[in-house]
Amino acid sequence: MKKLAFSAFGAALASVLACNEQPPLHVPGPTVAHPAGKSIELPQSQASVALLARKNDTARVVAFRVLFDVGSSEDPAGKEGLTALTTSMTAESGTRDLTFAQLSRALYPMAASIGTSTERDQTVFTADVAAADLPRFYALLKDVILTPRLDDESFRRLSQRAKSSLEDELKGANDEALGKEALDAAIYEDHPYGHPPVGTAAGLASITLDDVKAQRSRVFCKDRVTVGIAGAFPDGFDKKVAQDFAALPACPSARPGLPEPKKHTGLKVVIVDKPSADSTAISIGFPTTMTRTSDDWPGAFFFTSYVGLHRQSAGVLYNRLREARGLNYGDYSYSEHFEQDGWSRFTLPNIARREQNVSIWIRPVKPANGAFALRGAMHYWREYVEHGVPDAEIQRFGTFLSRYQSLEQQTESRRLGFALDDKTYKLQTPFIERVRAAWSQLDSKKLAEIVKRDLATKDMTIAIIAKDAAALKKLLVSGTKTPPAYDAPKPKEVTDEDRILEAEPLGLKDEDVKIVPIADLFAK
């Protein structure tokens, strides 16, 4: 998530604009009762937009999440990256009355921030402010989203930043993220999900300021927005916000549907040949018809968490590949598309997809251990898919996982984000309550049935970032054993198991493994 923290403008405190001096919020009309800790929804009408509010008078902050049902899947062909760039231009070009520099100076004294996130199907603007500063902050936030400046100078600046994010950051310096995006590109070949939200080189080069303005009018519109607010806001404020955001234009057309991902049989491997890579990054996955709306999803979430809960030592993959063998920093698996929220270990809310995938993430390993790490991950995944999780383990891990969910919702903003996700998926029971209830009834038989229905496919896609793709392809296709290269001796129980892992069958043929030069990846 991009976040605009305006600490760089400390020297400008003396020149804070008069626009900071806002009168108290005028809240017209009847108020809405807000039971503590509960979500209140105001439906869309001619005079307002859809709104979800969570009032908490004991909070010291007010959190905003302005969620649009639009993402990179609606980038026009040849303009890949347009939605994300339009989002940045909305948040970071200033307002009709303020330049970006003036806006930054106005926000600094409030220690306020505005963040954005664009994924395949959703874009969210996030903001947090001290409750005491709500009137003047909201006046700015409203103008940022409703009347952005969209000027030439900001377009040049943000367009160049997007190009740098693609070439220098994603492709140049972040092989972990690159591997995940390469996996999406392989799973969703010739599909609207097939390019990263930041775009492609050709797409970014072709985008004009007029394209940004047209995309904003086309998809950042009234019928696609839900405004979320949480915290210590005054009575009636939610109604005012819903009415203010009705100034967004009407949506000119319905949202287009999505095609099904292409199908293949067995394992399909894409190796991105990156000569400068000093390690090997691996991502594995497959598309699924499951989303959070599915009855099986809580069980699938339990299983993937047991095998590889994100950044937790409780997972099988973490224990066997990192703890026992020291191959990397961690190994995880997910029942839906996952992104980490900043530097935390928690999931980023408001990245819901209409089509989902199950994935395994093997953090970068030494090149000498790339094939072994891949085989190890496949072995443990297959083992638990085939043999299941014992009842005693379900009870033990279920207790931990149920309590862990509370940590996911520690702030007003994150609780609001989860509530918006519940609304997106049309869930009547809040996320935590739903999964805890499902897990309390889970046993080995029920879990095995869910795994068999939803996770037992042999048709998986593997994306690898490697420095010598040709050599790695030859090794994988040959079927030759790939023993690990350790820096220190390992216990006999580990080395005995290594004999199994290093020979884990992949069944790959030459045509199953494709090499993509790094220069060609996301070029167009």
Q: Whereabouts are the PLM-identified features?
A:
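Histidine-acidic residue clusters that define the catalytic metal-binding segment
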Residues: 23-43, 166, 184-225, 252, ...
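M16/MPP (pitrilysin/insulinase) zinc-metallopeptidase core fold and M16-derived inactive scaffolds
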Residues: 64-128, 194-198, 311-340, 352
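Non-catalytic, conformational "gating/processing" segments within enzyme and secreted inhibitor domains
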Residues: 155, 159, 164, 168, ...
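Short acidic/His-enriched helical or mixed secondary-structure segments at domain edges of catalytic enzymes
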Residues: 161-182, 260-279, 324-328, 332-343, ...
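Acidic/histidine-enriched segments that form metal/cofactor-coordinating
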Residues: 20-27, 103-215, 260-262, 375-379, ...
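An aromatic/glycine/proline-enriched structural segment found at the starts
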Residues: 23-32, 189, 226-290, 466-519
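C-terminal motif of bacterial Sec signal peptides marking the signal peptidase cleavage site
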Residues: 16-18
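Extracytoplasmic
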Residues: 35-37, 46-48, 58-65, 77-82, ...
